[in-house]
Swiss-Prot record:
Domain of life (superkingdom): Eukaryota
Molecular-function GO term, any one: toxin activity
PROSITE patterns: DISINTEGRIN_1, DISINTEGRIN_2
Residue stretch(es) of the prosequence: 21-47
Residues spanning the signal sequence: 1-20
Organism from which the protein derives: Echis carinatus sochureki (Saw-scaled viper)
Lineage of source species: Eukaryota, Metazoa, Chordata, Craniata, Vertebrata
Entry protein name: Disintegrin EC6 subunit alpha
A single Gene Ontology CC term: extracellular region
Disintegrin domain location: 48-112
Role: Potently inhibits adhesion of alpha-4/beta-1 (ITGA4/ITGB1) and alpha-9/beta-1 (ITGA9/ITGB1) integrins to VCAM1, and adhesion of alpha-5/beta-1 (ITGA5/ITGB1) integrin to fibronectin. Has a much less effect on alpha-IIb/beta-3 (ITGA2B/ITGB3) integrin. Also potently inhibits neutrophil migration across TNF-alpha-activated human umbilical endothelial cells.
Length: 115
């Protein structure tokens, strides 16, 4: 059996750098499928993320921050409910932030065929 050390890079949306977790010494069977034995998280600061909202180890928002990126995320916080996140096109209906998510939900008055 071949012993391998796999490194999976957790990518933050901006700037496409994040942290790593290491899957230690997994075995590869005849079909080259990896069965890891143990997951070891790198210590805090092992990799430095240049994104101010992203914890470099967990790729999650830092303590006290709400989000990392998205149309309803600015300076690591959710935009206020009612903030326009997508301007109206042909249908004349804007999409608005909810204040509790970094996503830009579809305006509930838009039909399924509208976008």
């Amino acid at each position: 059996m071949i012993q391998v050390l796999l490194v999976i890079i957790c990518l933050a949306v901006f700037p496409y750098q994040g942290s790593s977790i290491i899957l230690e010494s997994g075995n590869i069977n005849d079909y080259e499928i990896v069965y890891p034995k143990k997951v070891a998280v790198l210590p805090t600061g092992a990799m430095n993320s240049v994104h101010p909202c992203c914890d470099p180890v967990t790729c999650e928002p830092r303590e006290g921050e709400h989000c990392i990126s998205g149309p309803c995320c600015r300076n690591c916080k959710f935009l206020n409910a009612g903030t326009i996140c997508k301007k109206a096109m042909l249908d004349g209906l804007n999409d608005y932030c909810t204040g509790i998510s970094s996503d830009c939900p579809r305006n509930r008055y838009k039909g399924k065929e509208d976008d």
